[in-house]
Amino acid sequence: MKFNQFSYIPVSPETAYQELRSLGFEVSLDASAKANFESFVRKYFLFFEDTDLALKNWIADPETDLLSFFQSDRPLTAEVFGLVALQLLGFVPNVDFTDSVAFLEKMAFPIAFDGSLNNLHQLLATRTQSGNTLIDQLVAQDLIPISNDYVFFNGKSLATFDTNQLHREVVYVETPVDTDKDGLLDLVKVTILRPNVDFPVPAMMTASPYQQGTNEPSSDKLTHKMEGDLLVKPAGKISLSRPEIKAPEADLTPINPVTKAEERFAHTDTYTLNDYMLARGVASIYVSGVGTFNSEGFMTSGDYQQVLAYKAVIDWLNGRARAFTSRSRQHTITADWASGKVTTTGLSYLGTMSNALATTGVDGLEMVIAEAGISSWYDYYRENGLLVSPGGYPGEDLDTLTEFTYSRALLAGEYLRHQKDYEAYLNELSTAIDRKHGDYNQFWHDRNYVQFADRVKATVVFTHGSQDWNVKPINVYQMFRALPKSLEKHLFFHNGAHVYMNAWQSIDFRESMNALICQKLLGLDNGYTLPTVIWQNNQSEQTWEVLDNFGHDNGKHIQLGKSEASIANHYEEEIFAKYGKAYQSFKDDLFMDKANAITLDFELDQDIQINGRVHLELRVKSSTNRGLISAQVLEMGDKKYLAPIPELKRMSLDNGRLFKEEALRELPFKQAKYRVITKGHLNLQNRKDLLSIENVTPNEWMTIGLDLQPTIYKPNKGDKLRLVLYTTDFEHTIRDNSDYEVTVDLSQSKMTLPY
């Protein structure tokens, strides 16, 4: 374990004293450091009446138990403080460590001992080996009582709300859209978990089309075949118009208003970051949206109709939209329990809707936590004029996702009434996505949130993984960079895949979110400042660093060679079938120079931190009138790399007081032969830009530019980078087995590493 403490807020000695005393620690400004430390440690043993016995079972140094130390005349030193602090944090001498000084240094222990009360204050805010901060662990053990009111420590809310006596209610919010065109504005089901209190509370809202269930069997039947020819597209320029996202004014006329919801529930799937804040006084709201189980409308998959339907929930929390107690629309109900302040949460599609909602500029949305979210749906299913499936899901497209999330059809009565119209709508959508050409068009433009980034007013927190080939890093990169310069924004860029990071051992992500939420939603003047970019260093385990930005303008140019080299697109049928059946076998062969590719190795002559988009400038020609180029950059070398999927550790993370406990996680540092740094794909007909389609003349040289997926990665001098240039990618692109070649003039081609 390493300490990476970004949530702690430095305080004055007076504040440290006051907060310690308010929690029941009997420290004194007049007492010695040793006396205060003894009082602090004895308080830790909440379940012991005879704390002498507990102290005898801990040690102050290898020769002295802690009780004997406190009874002696010896002063408190940094060495004793450090050894006892380790035991307070759950580390066991002679098991987890033998040399406490070396162990503390190795773990980057964040507290510089000076004997002050600030040391004890910061120790409470430090994570234990179990993943909980020491103060959260003690509160879970009833250090302070459940009060159903806010208690803050170090600018963060503590788990003082009763999660056994929550309001669990359902309402149906009226949206400004009629997506199924039945003449009625669509209602969306809203599932609410909130503290049982008599004062207004803010809310964490998760907009998830998956929340009420999915239709996987029907979606699987629509999965597209990836084998086929790369078509020649007619040359031309694509024209677009700016989408209109203004909603009509809501009808706020009450209808037989009531103050109590008539529908409740026993269980719903939850997100543990929401659970964590629910125990700390923030309501938790889940909305599936239009076209889902027990909501109305059709699944419009990423357009602003879907977004405005989610926005209506925030409007309802602020008195700007109506909600009904049931879909019969007989009684309206207001959110009289809500303060109106909201943050959105969730990963993938959920993070996508966070991005989209932010671009509406809706009042009340104070903060957005967008984890691995899409910012432009074209960049999820397409790339540079090509069909490019999300990593791990070849053959998926927006129509299959629409079918997957259209859970309204899981209700047999709804299926009976609406399926015919829905299937007609789905056929229109399947045509509009244009799998035939793979081009950007108005359909995709209507699902591009980046163009409205200037409307974002909320504080934005992004998380994204460098190894996320599902929602690829271009999505966070372009949104992060498009936001107004005056806006507060933050990015946690880790080395994982498409994964949550709130339960990781190495970083206090959820505590950082607690501090921000208290500041933005509860109005707490805690002075908290989160760095703009927090990056997980790829060179060692559990190491995080602060960076100034994502994307740098400096570039290191690497000439690719001195000759020409060719890529054969065609494979023997047996090999082609093998790769199509198991794309991982293709990747294994590709990276080991056993597939059809140009493989180039470069030894770095300097340390460098790649930050941004690796750019390829290639002089190429195709033997036919079409073609695609794919590229991947890897670090080669048999050594330890961070694996992309977190390993589960012990079930020790408590989100309240024995509430929604979950497993601690961390990316393992494992031996491997290589690490993918970045990748990219380009249709040669889109070599100028995304909106320009040009002819490819057989055997005529072209100069193309290809920006690969943005990343942050640090190799050292002497490390070997491998650039692989190829055509068909069996995981991502169309699988065209035509017999043609792409030739690259390496002497006129280069790779630029941004830093």
From Swiss-Prot:
UniProt entry keywords in alphabetical sequence: Aminopeptidase, Cytoplasm, Hydrolase, Protease, Serine protease
Recorded GO molecular functions are: aminopeptidase activity; dipeptidyl-peptidase activity; serine-type peptidase activity
Q: Which GO terms describe its cellular component?
A: cytoplasm
- The reply on keyword Kinase is no
| Catalytic activities | Hydrolyzes Xaa-Pro-|- bonds to release unblocked, N-terminal dipeptides from substrates including Ala-Pro-|-p-nitroanilide and (sequentially) Tyr-Pro-|-Phe-Pro-|-Gly-Pro-|-Ile
Instruction: Tell me where it mainly resides.
Output: cytoplasm
- The active site of this protein is located at S348, D468, H498
Cross-referenced InterPro entries: AB_hydrolase_fold, Galactose-bd-like_sf, Pept_S15_Xpro, PepX_N_dom, PepX_N_dom_sf, Xaa-Pro-like_dom, Xaa-Pro_dipept_C
Q: Which GO terms describe its biological process?
A: proteolysis
State its location(s): Cytoplasm
Catalytic EC class: hydrolase
Q: List the disulfide bonds.
A: none
EC code = 3.4.14.11
Subunit-level organization: Homodimer.
Which family does the record claim for this protein? Belongs to the peptidase S15 family.
Function (record text): Removes N-terminal dipeptides sequentially from polypeptides having unsubstituted N-termini provided that the penultimate residue is proline.
Q: What is this protein called?
A: Xaa-Pro dipeptidyl-peptidase
Show the taxonomic lineage.
Bacteria, Bacillati, Bacillota, Bacilli, Lactobacillales
